[in-house]
């Protein structure tokens, strides 16, 4: 039986594509394995998926771009993770390793290359993260969501592979209940803060609940169960799975962070959106770059977190609603998306 090893983690964005691809390989008779951190979100997501995947936990160390005494300890963790991954590779002898990035992916990528296993990696952001910069040196091929520099000879630009489906599913009962609390004469605004929510969005909704719910129906994915609430023109929930796409479809506008997975999902369904990227003090600036790219393409509006107020947000929302047709036309004309089926066929072709 053919074997494939997946890796990637730290955030949901480093796991999502793997979760989409693994069922395809399982259906085609592959034995599927995953290397990650048993304490990480990658392990949680695989357990929730119920997929027939064997998980292998390794030691991980965070890759930092700044000086920290923890770097010394993490060098040893990464080294031990490489040794553990090498033993896994030599025992399994897989035909391929597929990496979605994140610091947990570096040891398996290095181990795969050392043991002669072809390495395929995927980069979602406009600029490569540190983990993928290292992984690229060991990769057989890299697939990218955005176009990359021509000097990167192993990169193939494939566009975004999203989890949003074109199929219309029956409305969940919970969605019907939510809609009974909404005023259908008002626009609906969905706040999406990534897998763990966004404190800045939660605080804005908490501080301005009265003003917001007088003008909009508000959906707030918080990442914090203590904020859960369903009341007039307001639905706050910590986490959703099957309800995610129905909520996207219900919303007129989405206010989101600038993670590539989320904004390309919005592009795929031509949903109006305001991007509030993580600042450079909290990230490497990749979300700022992603947001600027989407604004330049005419897909979205952006708003820096330091400038986020009720008034500044309402100005962006009003502008999007007033120019809805223009934004949606540009999104619908985009050639930057690839179906999961097409990407899977491309990956299989490259393996042959």
From Swiss-Prot:
It holds the Pfam family Glyco_transf_28. The keyword Cell division applies. GO terms for biological process: carbohydrate metabolic process; cell division; cell wall organization; lipid glycosylation; peptidoglycan biosynthetic process; regulation of cell shape. It is found in: Cell membrane. GO terms for molecular function: undecaprenyldiphospho-muramoylpentapeptide beta-N-acetylglucosaminyltransferase activity. Keywords: Cell cycle, Cell division, Cell membrane, Cell shape, Cell wall biogenesis/degradation, Glycosyltransferase, Membrane, Peptidoglycan synthesis, Transferase. It comes from the Bacteria. InterPro entries: GlcNAc_MurG (IPR006009), Glyco_trans_28_C (IPR007235), GlycoTrans_28_N (IPR004276). Pathway: Cell wall biogenesis; peptidoglycan biosynthesis. GO terms for cellular component: plasma membrane. It catalyses: Mur2Ac(oyl-L-Ala-gamma-D-Glu-L-Lys-D-Ala-D-Ala)-di-trans,octa-cis-undecaprenyl diphosphate + UDP-N-acetyl-alpha-D-glucosamine = beta-D-GlcNAc-(1->4)-Mur2Ac(oyl-L-Ala-gamma-D-Glu-L-Lys-D-Ala-D-Ala)-di-trans,octa-cis-undecaprenyl diphosphate + UDP + H(+). UDP-N-acetyl-alpha-D-glucosamine binds at residues 195, 287. It is a peripheral membrane protein. Its EC number is 2.4.1.227. Cell wall formation. Catalyzes the transfer of a GlcNAc subunit on undecaprenyl-pyrophosphoryl-MurNAc-pentapeptide (lipid intermediate I) to form undecaprenyl-pyrophosphoryl-MurNAc-(pentapeptide)GlcNAc (lipid intermediate II). Belongs to the glycosyltransferase 28 family. MurG subfamily. This is UDP-N-acetylglucosamine--N-acetylmuramyl-(pentapeptide) pyrophosphoryl-undecaprenol N-acetylglucosamine transferase. It comes from Streptococcus pneumoniae (strain ATCC 700669 / Spain 23F-1). The lineage of its organism: Bacteria, Bacillati, Bacillota, Bacilli, Lactobacillales.
């Amino acid at each position: 039986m053919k074997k494939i090893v997946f890796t990637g983690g730290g955030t949901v964005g480093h796991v999502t594509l793997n979760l989409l691809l693994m069922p395809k390989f399982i259906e085609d008779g592959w034995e599927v394995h995953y290397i990650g951190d048993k304490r990480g979100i990658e392990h949680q997501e695989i357990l929730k998926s119920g997929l027939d995947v064997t998980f292998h936990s390794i030691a991980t160390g965070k890759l930092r771009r700044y000086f920290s005494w923890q770097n010394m300890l993490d060098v040893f963790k990464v080294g031990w993770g490489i040794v553990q991954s090498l033993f896994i590779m030599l025992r399994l002898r897989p035909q391929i390793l597929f990496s979605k990035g994140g610091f947990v992916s570096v040891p398996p990528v290095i181990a795969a290359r050392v043991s002669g296993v072809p390495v395929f990696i995927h980069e979602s952001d406009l600029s490569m993260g540190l983990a993928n910069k290292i992984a690229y040196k060991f990769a057989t091929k890299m697939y990218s969501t955005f176009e990359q520099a021509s000097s990167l000879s192993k990169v193939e630009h494939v566009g975004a592979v999203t989890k949003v489906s074109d199929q219309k599913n029956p409305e969940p009962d919970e969605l019907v209940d939510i809609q009974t609390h909404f005023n259908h004469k008002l626009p609906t605004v969905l706040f999406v803060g990534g897998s763990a929510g966004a404190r800045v969005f939660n605080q804005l909704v908490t501080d301005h609940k009265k003003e917001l719910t007088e003008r909009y129906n508000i959906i707030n994915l918080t990442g914090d169960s203590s904020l859960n609430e369903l009341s007039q023109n307001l639905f706050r929930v910590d986490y959703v799975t099957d309800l995610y796409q129905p909520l996207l479809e219900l919303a007129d506008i989405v206010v989101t962070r600038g993670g590539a997975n989320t904004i390309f999902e919005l592009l795929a369904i031509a949903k109006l959106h305001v991007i509030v990227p993580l600042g450079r003090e909290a990230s490497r600036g990749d979300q700022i770059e992603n947001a600027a790219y989407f604004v330049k393409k005419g897909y979205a509006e952006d708003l820096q977190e330091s400038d986020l107020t009720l008034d500044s947000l309402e100005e962006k929302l009003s502008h999007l609603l007033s120019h809805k047709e223009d934004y949606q036309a540009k999104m619908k004309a985009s050639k930057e998306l690839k179906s999961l089926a097409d990407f899977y066929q491309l990956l299989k072709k490259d393996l042959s």
